[in-house]
């Protein structure tokens, strides 16, 4: 499955962003993104934190968040990828973060405490410690 181009030309639509972000399954994912130590988890990490959701369902929700410019994809360049490790990570866009801050949604500090409290497998700890590409 191909992820949509996160660099679309459409203007950020505040109402649509809030509508998509506050849908419960997507809000759960955004909370996990906000709480991640790097602010950019992979689908594998999100699936671990949301065992009731399949990776396909998570990808579908992320695609909607990317389409509304709430989340953007950070992709490891082909020459820098590590075998058997994720190459795509998801982070909240600057526009969405400003909107969330203004409305008291997804406060990073609160979700980081929650994220830290989750017991993780060795594999998830390894993935969590991977370097992430930086947003441009």
Could you describe each region identified by the protein language model?
Residues 18-25, 76-102:
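Short, cationic-aromatic polyanion-contact patches
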Residues 53-54, 58:
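Short coil turns linking two alpha-helices in DNA-binding domains
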Residues 66-78:
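A short, conserved structural fragment
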Residues 95-136:
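Amphipathic alpha-helical dimerization/coiled-coil segments
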């Amino acid at each position: 499955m191909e992820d949509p181009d996160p660099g679309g030309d459409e203007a950020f639509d505040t109402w649509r962003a809030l509508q998509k972000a506050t849908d419960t399954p997507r809000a759960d994912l955004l909370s996990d993104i906000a709480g991640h130590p790097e602010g950019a988890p992979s689908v594998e990490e999100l699936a671990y934190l949301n065992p009731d959701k399949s990776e396909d369902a998570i990808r579908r929700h992320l695609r909607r968040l990317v389409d509304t410019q709430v989340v953007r994809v950070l992709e490891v360049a082909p020459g820098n990828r590590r075998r058997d490790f994720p190459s795509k990570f998801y982070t909240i866009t600057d526009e969405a973060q400003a909107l969330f801050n203004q409305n008291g949604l997804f406060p990073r500090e609160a979700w980081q405490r929650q994220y830290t409290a989750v017991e993780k497998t060795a594999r998830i700890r390894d993935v969590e410690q991977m370097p992430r590409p930086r947003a441009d």
